[in-house]
A protein has these predicted regions:
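Sec-dependent N-terminal signal peptides of Gram-positive bacterial secreted proteins and lipoproteins
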Residues: 1-26
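Extracytoplasmic cell-surface/polysaccharide-interacting catalytic and binding patches
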Residues: 19-141, 145-260
Length: 260
């Protein structure tokens, strides 16, 4: 009987005792369990990062992908216009302005205009040219669908369609319609748009400095099979500083940059 009573009392004490020692011990065990679980989760996350690109890389890829998706958006600075991809005949940028730069001709003319984002960058480029004693003038900026049709038809009648295709864009396929392009020249070549401009001091300076202000030489030498057009050292296209520098650094073209 005493033995039975002893066990009953012992059991009562074990169940009801609120000893701090027991409480701390159980809490510690619980914390250790949580730490172990957290460590396991962290280990799993680290393993996932090893197996897959980091979130930062994924975000960068997504950012570039979104920009590249915009090649079909006429208002995007990376819009791609070439022989395969064109613009709607009715597309006219709404933010065309005349940049504050010298031109090869006087008077008010639509071809003096470009989009405001490109105009601001062009003004800075020309200001730097003046600072470096480099003479540059604007020759031809924005060109409407209808105006491009007139130019192409004239060249086709003069030299034939095949020849015209090498240096003149068909209507809807001219970068000038984007409002992001400007042809430039200098007195060294009598303000003409000729390949010799690329060999002048002004042409070499332009090729080097244009990317610093967001422009690329859109049709570089040796890339005719990619761009579809002959070398045009005078043809500037605005794409933004970051993109322009990358394209220039890789000696690339807009086509390669967008689809590589």
């Amino acid at each position: 009987m005493k033995k039975k009573l002893f066990f009953i009392i012992l059991l009562f004490l074990l169940v009801n005792t609120s000893s701090p020692t027991f409480s701390i011990t159980f809490t510690s065990i619980d914390n250790l369990s949580k730490e172990k679980n957290n460590k396991t989760i962290d280990d799993n996350i680290q393993q996932k990062k090893k197996e897959n690109p980091s979130n930062q890389i994924i975000e960068e890829i997504n950012t570039v992908a979104k920009e590249k998706e915009s090649v079909n958006n006429p208002l995007n600075k990376l819009v791609l216009v070439n022989k395969e991809q064109g613009l709607p005949s009715e597309f006219i940028p709404e933010d065309l302005v005349v940049p504050n730069i010298p031109f090869a001709f006087a008077g008010d003319h639509p071809k003096k205009k470009i989009r405001i984002v490109a105009a601001k960058a062009l003004e800075k480029l020309f200001a730097k040219a003046k600072e470096d004693n480099i003479e540059l003038v604007g020759v031809s900026g924005y060109r409407s669908f209808n105006r491009q049709k007139e130019i192409f038809d004239y060249n086709a009648r003069l030299k034939g369609v095949e020849a015209a295709n090498q240096y003149s864009a068909k209507p809807g396929h001219s970068e000038h319609q984007t409002g992001l392009a400007m042809d430039v020249s200098s007195s060294a070549v009598n303000y003409d748009l000729v390949e010799e401009f690329g060999e002048t001091e002004e042409g070499r300076w332009l090729s080097k400095m244009a990317p610093e202000y967001g422009f690329i030489i859109r049709y570089p030498k040796g890339k005719e099979n990619i761009t579809g057009y002959q070398y045009e050292p005078w043809h500037l296209r605005y794409v933004g500083v970051e993109h322009a520098k990358k394209i220039a650094y890789n000696d690339s073209t807009l086509e390669d940059y967008l689809y590589s």
